[in-house]
Amino acid sequence: MATFQSLPGFREFYPDALARRNHIFRLWRQTAVAFGFAEYDAPVLEPLELYKTKSGDEIEAQLFSFTDKGGREVALRPEMTPTVCRMVGAKANALKRPIKWFSIAEYYRYERAQKGRERAFFQFNADLFAEPGPEAEIELIALLTQCLKAFGLTEQDFYIRLSDRNLWFFYLEALGLDEPRIRAVLSAVDKFEKVGDDAFKPYAEQFGPLDLALKQRVLEFLQIKTLASLEQTLAPLGGEKLAARLGDWRKLLDGLAAMGLSPFIEVDLGVVRGLAYYTGFVFEAFDRKGELRAIAGGGRYNDLVKKLGGPDLPAVGFAIGDVTLGLLLDARGLMPAFVQASDVYCVIGGAAERQAAFADVNALRAAGFKVDYPLKDVPFGKQFKLAADSGAKLALIYGPDELAKNVVKLRDLTTRTETDVPREQVQAMVRDFFSTD
């Protein structure tokens, strides 16, 4: 007989796993709403061209794509940013600004399944449109930090690495590189931490080996860890645009400090983000012990709305993945144990008593109580074991004697005390029991 298993990288959520997922979603949603963000959703299937031209080569290589029955080339979404930019661009004139949106959705990437990485995964995405200044980054980084602190994580558990593609462009242009070479160098910088010098091989294949002196300057820039060092290194370049950009850095770091977030922030120019559309500040969150891949990442993408046919609208966004976050919460002992427990269990004597119990079961459920009962006739002794296994705190006993007296016996399953209650008072007594529990 054939057996079927789920596909590699696609998770099945049994009730306990789904309870964990819902816990994560609930705190994400609660935090975003507290920051004034509105929730949205979008199609899971999109035109293939949306990602081929906007997300970059790495994402394109990971797409689940096919030709549908109408002859259209389509793909399961690997990310949300192009979609939300299209949505905002389509109704930009009607939307109240700044536009602060979030979503919790599933994404698909055909890559090797490994620790912290699946082929189907959920992300919390938050984006802020129509604010060109660093005030937007302050708000987004504050939201990211709180989305992780909400689970009990502290500055001892995670930190956020902050970088700037703009400053990289200023610096590399000053070293004499044109835009194609700058992008190739940034691609190498993005991978340097993982693979070392091998990160520069694609540059060499495309343009020839990078000049050793220039490469040394790149590696020195990578080592900068403070704003003061940034200013000192870039001071000889001069220019109003560079001065303004360094002013943005001061405003951003001062704003984060005023929010009390400095313990979470590290200047780290090794973060450039691989996606093609980032244009300014970029940031990633990591666990302090360095045991996991990035927990979250994002940055500014000022050109994408316009490239997708909308108005010229600046934007910043980030995403947190559920897989790595779940691993971190487990490692820190911060994922609660989820037990599905009833409030009330009905112990039923037989067919006649069952009919009487059904009215109370239905009324109590309608009143918001979690009520369970045996679906078939079972001996009383076994029913009390079922009641204990259900996690219920209260048992309602419907036996022949109780039915004859038009009462129900209430048993406190913790203290084992029992009380006879008139049928018409059952709901009120149950409510009183749980209000004083």
Swiss-Prot record:
Task: Give the intrachain disulfide bonds.
Answer: none
Record keywords: Aminoacyl-tRNA synthetase, ATP-binding, Cytoplasm, Ligase, Nucleotide-binding, Protein biosynthesis
An example Gene Ontology cellular component term from the record?
Answer: cytoplasm
**Catalysis: reaction(s):** tRNA(His) + L-histidine + ATP = L-histidyl-tRNA(His) + AMP + diphosphate + H(+)
Compartment annotation: Cytoplasm
HAMAP family registered for this protein in UniProt: His_tRNA_synth (MF_00127)
Q: How does it assemble?
A: Homodimer.
What is the protein's name according to its record?
Answer: Histidine--tRNA ligase
UniProt lists the gene as hisS
